[in-house]
Every structure is written in C-alpha cells, then in structure tokens.
Amino acid sequence: MDVKTYPVLEAAKNRTLVDNATYLKWYEESVADPEKFWGEHGKRIEWFEPYTTVKNTSFDGNVSIKWFEDGLTNVSYNCIDRHLKTHGEKTAIIWEGDNPYIDKRITYNELYDKVCRLANVLKKHGVEKGDRVTIYMPMVPEAAYAMLACARIGAIHSVVFGGFSPEALAGRIVDCESTFVITCDEGLRGGKPVPLKENTEKAIDIAARQHVMVNKVLVVRRTGGKVPWAPGRDVWYHQEIATVEPHCPPEKMRAEDPLFILYTSGSTGKPKGVLHTTGGYLVYASMTHQYVFDYHDGDIYWCTADVGWVTGHSYIVYGPLANAATTLMFEGVPNFPDAGRFWEVIDKHKVNIFYTAPTAIRSLMGAGDDFVNRSSRSSLRLLGTVGEPINPEAWEWYYHVVGAERSPIVDTWWQTETGGILITPLPGATDLKPGSATRPFFGVKPQIVDNEGNVIDGPADGNLCITDSWPGQMRTVYGDHERFIQTYFSTYKGKYFTGDGCRRDEDGYYWITGRVDDVLNVSGHRLGTAEVESALVSHHLVSEAAVVGYPHPIKGQGIYCYVSLMAGEVGSDELRQELVKHVRSEIGPIATPDKIQFAPGLPKTRSGKIMRRILRKIAEDDFGSLGDTSTLADPAVVDDLIANRQNRG
C-alpha cells in the first residue's frame, strides 16, 4: 500500500529535546538495561527517601509488578510544592468555561492553597490514607483539586465521568466501597445543565441497597441550581474550605501505594477497577508528557479530554503538573456555540500544544474549513491525537488545515491500563505516516503474535502484546487480582495482551487496527458489548440481545444491537426509542445505540455461543462472505437476519 511519509519538520528538529539519534540510543539502552535506564529517569521526580530497587516485575504465574518499591514520595508534592520556589506565580491551570466569555487562571501558589484546604476538609471528615473517595465532577478546576487533595493525604480517588448514569456511578461506588463522594450541584455542557447532584442522590440509594453506605457528600456550587439535599450528610465545598488551614503536610507514600482506581470496560460483565500506584505512574506520566509533546517551560498545553478518562488523569492533571506546565482545562464541547470553538480557544489562550481525539477531528472536519480558517492558530507548534486509531483522511485534514503544515502530529496509542503513552512519534525524531502510531516509547517492548501465540517478526499483522513491564503499568484489578491475570496475561502466557490488533510495516512502524475482543471503541471511549447487552436485557420486553460494532463516519465505531423480544411482543419504532432511552439511563449517553434490529433469533453454535463474527458482517452489509457457518445450530436464522436488515433504525 502506498503510504505518504512526512519527514520531521525543520522547526521541530531545531528545538527538540530528543532527535532521532538520541531516540535510537535511549530506546536501545531502555530495553537492554531497564534497571539502569529507569533508575536514572526515576530521579525526575523528588523522593523523600530514595529507592534502591528499580524494577521487580514478573508477567508469569501470579503476575507481580513493582517499581521503585522502597522509595517514599508524594504525587501532590511533586505536582505542586516542589515548583513553588521557582514557579509559584506561574499559571498552573487555565480554566475555559462552557460559556466562551468565562475563564480563569490558577497559579501554582493558588493551587497549593486550594489543594491543601481540600485535603484538610477530607481529613476533617475522617478520610484516611487508603480510603476510597469517589469524584463525580464536570471539567472544573475543583476536579483537579480533589484528585490532588486525595493524593496528598494518601486517599485513593475513583473519578467517574460526569456523563455516566446513576446506575453506572453506583456500580463504581459499590465496587470500591467508597463512603465519600465529591460532586457538583450541576455540570454545564453545551449550555445545558447536567444533574450531577441529583444523579449522585440516586446512585447513593442504589449503593445503599447493596450495603455500601455513603456517609458524606461534598458539593461544589457550579450553577446555583436547586438540588436535593440531605442535612448532616451533604456539605458545601465553599463553606467547608473556609473553615480549615491553607497548609497540609504531604503524606509520605510508598511508591507502590495505590494512587487511583479508574473503571474501564472489559469484554465481560461489569467494568474493571484499574489500579495505578504512586511512584512509577508519576515517573511515566511526567516523562511521556515531556518527551512526546516536546514540552518546554513556558508552553501552553491543552488536552481536550475529560478527567473522567485516563487521558485526563495522565495528560491534563498529573503529567503536566509534575512538569510545572500550564495545563488548560476545558468545560465545554467542540461544537458550542459553534464548530469554531476549539480554534478560538487556541487563539485566545495562545495554545502551543493541542491534544484531542479523532472523533472530534472527524466531526469538525465535517463542519467545514471555514470554522478553522477564521482563526489564526499561529501559536500552535504541535498536534496530538488519542483514544482510537485516526483514519488517514482525518490525519491529513488535521495536518494541512488545522496545523497549516507547521505542526507535527503525535498519534499516540495507549490504554487506561498502561498509565501513559506506549507507541508514539516523537516530534523532533520521527518521520510521520498518516494513520500510524509509529514507534514504541522508551522501555516499551511490543510484540506481534498470531492467534496461536506464535511470534511474528518483521512486517506482520496480528495481536499486539507487550513483553516486559514499564513503570506506568496498572498493578491489578481492584479487589480481583485473578481477573487481572485472566484478562491480560492468560491469552498469551508471559505477555501483556493489549486486546488490540496491530500491523507492523517494513520500517518497523506500528499501525493499530482496533480491538480484537468484544470491546467497542465509540468516540475514543471503551465500552464492553456485554455492558450494553445486559442493559438491553434488563428491559422487561427483551429476552436476548447481541451487540457489535460497525464502522461509523464520526464515532469510529457505532453501536449495532440485535434484539430478540419476549414471546408475543412485536418490535416498533416506539419500542426502539424506549430501548435507546433505557440503555442511556442504565449506562449513560455514551452508550446510545445507533441501530437496533429486532431479530426473532440470533445465530448460535450448537453449544449456544452467539457467533458475533456473523452479526458484525451483517451490520456492515458484508454478508457475501460469512465464512464457515457449519457449526450453526439453525442456519435459517442468518437468512432471516439478512432479509430483515432493513428493519433497523
């Protein structure tokens, strides 16, 4: 296949922290002697007591991952206190509100004050080291304060995306037995209020029925809207922080003490609590932030993600603040008030580094070039993408139209589980190919295997594994180490299996081809097909459901649902709408089905397993090559699904 290559731009080459020769040298050192390499780079953060052990990891047997394990440090101290002498008056966070006329800047000195006060409020209400605190917030600075305050006192935060439903929030509260929730009266998205406190109330009731009692809710006032209130349990953030001291000593944390839990979708059942720890995570998040984005002091850096996702954790909060950067937090959406919003924000705040998702790029590309061209974007020098593979057409538009051919694009591949970027170009070192994540970051050892687990060398197409640990890697599934081993290390023994398909070309560049398990990637966010199926089946008229992904021009993957109804029930447009609403209320708007096809039967093997491969083909209108159907219990079901495929909406 003929692929255009874009050589490293002269401007990027001239200011880069890492040129190609340095990349090759460091990479070789990092995989040949990881102990020595990370022993050196672990010193990029400050330690109260230095580590003497660097790497103690095993991908075999009981799988154990430990980095810098005898060192003592604190993430909040590294993101704030250590910068105060030299960068105290520097802007730490630029907050751009949903309303284009509202913004504010928070300096590192102010950040220290806010985080210490909030840490003292947590302590006042009995939160101790190791306790789990749930954060269900919109994109406001207080969300970052809450994360850093937890880290300061050694509490473990579990941030839940503000777009998730009360049921999804409750599931996450119950799984980690969290008794303290931080939320807002309401969020604002695209000019519309989001009922966060009301959702929290419902979630607390659901959790209580499962014997997990939330005994304190700290509420940030964002809109001033009327919200349900439980005196004694609920307290206002603004009142509480006025009652405490503006200083709070950072807890000395072991490198392997938990920092946060973040729930992510799997191919089976309920979301997994991905557990990240303190030292290795911060070393990796800060190092990738510096070198992948070629961050120099004074750069204005904007990642458009939400703190409810791992990208927000690593590349809005922890990575940038550990590097004393100015990080922009955006409350709004790309198309409000119109599709020029991103580009206006770039001009307004003179953004140098811009990191967003292919979904947003595709949707803004569809809105036309005029919205882009009415801004200058002259401050931009680096573009990035994250969340899903970017199609070459969108890459080219991003490079030529948004970047005006002046900014390299770092197409970054990583996961909630990896803690930070694993495969990526480095702007001053890597020639670019549209659609390729290019080469591994330092210390990352990718391997492509076939379905039987045989290693394929050279140009290859197969399943992407990583053969050795890196400091940012998740340590376990919260409360379920067996599930951790089963999910990531049992498919290909002794290797971390990413769940992604991958192609490596003749230049050694990696091209991510998408999930190979039953996980959807919708608008850059992971969603398990099992989650959507169980939401559908919980509706009283549904007897069975199967969910697959199909190519979607904006979202990357759309959600296609095959639904079998209870005996005697008939599908209708009204029922279709009702099911869409039902799924949204069970999981959240992110899980909105794009197409629902009523199906009297589903294609199953004689052992009762649904043949999703066939369902995917029908969803994609590719039923000319269904492959081997000899194991089907009832082949007529497939003919019926094909004949009835117009019955989708």
UniProtKB/Swiss-Prot annotation:
Post-translational modification, as annotated: Acetylated. Deacetylation by the SIR2-homolog deacetylase activates the enzyme.
Necessary cofactors: Mg(2+)
Catalytic activity: acetate + ATP + CoA = acetyl-CoA + AMP + diphosphate
GO molecular function: acetate-CoA ligase activity; AMP binding; ATP binding; metal ion binding
Signal sequence, start to end: none
Binding site for ATP: G387, E388, P389, D411, T412, W413, W414, Q415, T416, D500, R515, R526
Residues at which CoA binds: R189, G190, G191, K192, T311, N335, S523, R584
Name this polypeptide is given: Acetyl-coenzyme A synthetase
Gene (name only): acsA
